[in-house]
Regions:
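RNA-interacting cores
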Residues: 1-178
Length: 178
């Protein structure tokens, strides 16, 4: 599931992601927040972007439990409060998009894919490897993260496999990075 909230502000950008993480935690149950803090892999992601001169906060969840515990409470918000900045921000528009497991699996396995993919990261991205953060693109870390997330939400498939990961990395290359 995906929730996009148009925020009535020009004052925040991707650097406030940790503050928005706090907004999520303040709007979900304490019990679920505690469970999330114990997870190695979060069942959601969030980012802030600028689109057509608007500030958009996007929250995506990977399973029904995260949808019910994160997106549903946030979809009720008419404003958010950034505690560290002491800033109250109105939510002026919301859009929700839902896909069920079958739609995702069909899209993943049946949709034709071009030979070359262009991936654009909308916010700074880092991966943890050997206890350190890696800020440069590393195909092994990108693929492993995607495989783990897919496995975490799929009851039918365990996607993570060292042999498959090795083959993906071997058959891929980063041709441009900026």
């Amino acid at each position: 599931a995906e929730l996009q909230m148009e925020l009535e502000t020009k004052e925040i950008n991707y650097r406030q992601s940790s503050n928005l993480q706090g907004v999520i935690m303040e709007n979900i149950s304490q019990e679920y927040a505690a469970r999330l803090h114990g997870n190695q892999l979060n069942p959601y992601s969030q980012c802030i972007t600028r689109e057509n001169n608007s500030t958009i906060w996007t929250i995506k969840t990977l399973n029904e439990e995260a949808y019910e515990n994160i997106i549903m409470p946030l979809s009720e918000c008419t404003d958010i409060f950034l505690r560290k900045k002491g800033l109250s921000i109105s939510v002026c528009n919301k859009r929700m998009h839902l896909k069920n497991d079958n739609e995702l699996i069909t899209e993943f396995y049946e949709k034709k894919c071009p030979k070359y993919l262009e991936i654009k990261f909308q916010t700074p991205t880092a991966f943890k490897s050997d206890g350190k953060y890696v800020i440069y693109p590393d195909l092994g870390l990108i693929y492993a993260s995607l495989m783990r997330k897919y496995s975490a939400v799929s009851e039918a498939f365990d996607m993570f496999d060292e042999e498959t990961l090795g083959a993906l990395v071997e058959q891929s290359e980063i041709v441009r990075y900026r």
